[in-house]
Design a protein with these regions (language model features):
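Short boundary/loop segments of OB/S1/cold-shock single-stranded nucleic-acid-binding domains
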Residues: 9-27
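Beta-strand/loop nucleic-acid-binding surfaces
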Residues: 57-70
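Conserved small/polar residues in nucleotide/adenosyl-binding loops
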Residues: 116-122
Length: 123
């Protein structure tokens, strides 16, 4: 058996995270989906998933980014989430890091299919 190079788990996760960070298309994304598994953590962070009829995406909004949220999130709500996709190295999982969350259909959006006017807060 020819093993080739052997890497640590940390090295692989770090490499993949670096690949994600170099991909511009993942640095500013807007994703539409239904909220599920929403948890407001005592730290102030919000952990949730976005889902559609075929897939699910793990998401987090950190306490410092909650200025981009002006409503209380609940399971079952349809939203558009703006942020970036990256890898959480410790667990080796990719997720959406939310900066802005807008409910769909409550007057925040003038045109239901056009989200180009949404902008992410600068940090």
């Amino acid at each position: 058996m020819n093993r080739g190079n052997v890497y640590s788990v940390s090295s692989v996760n770090q490499y993949i995270k670096n690949m994600f960070s170099k991909e511009y298309a993942l640095s500013v994304v807007f994703v539409k989906g239904e909220i599920s598994n929403c948890k407001y953590h005592s730290s102030g962070h919000i952990y949730f998933s976005l889902k559609d009829d075929r897939s699910q995406l793990t998401c987090v909004m950190f306490r410092g980014d909650r200025g981009g949220l002006d409503f209380r999130m609940e399971n079952g709500q349809e939203v558009v989430v703006g942020g970036s996709i990256s890898v959480y190295e410790r667990d080796g999982k990719y997720q959406l890091y939310a900066k802005k969350i807008v409910p769909v259909g409550d007057g925040h959006l003038q045109e239901p299919v056009s989200y180009t006017h949404l902008t992410l807060p600068t940090t």
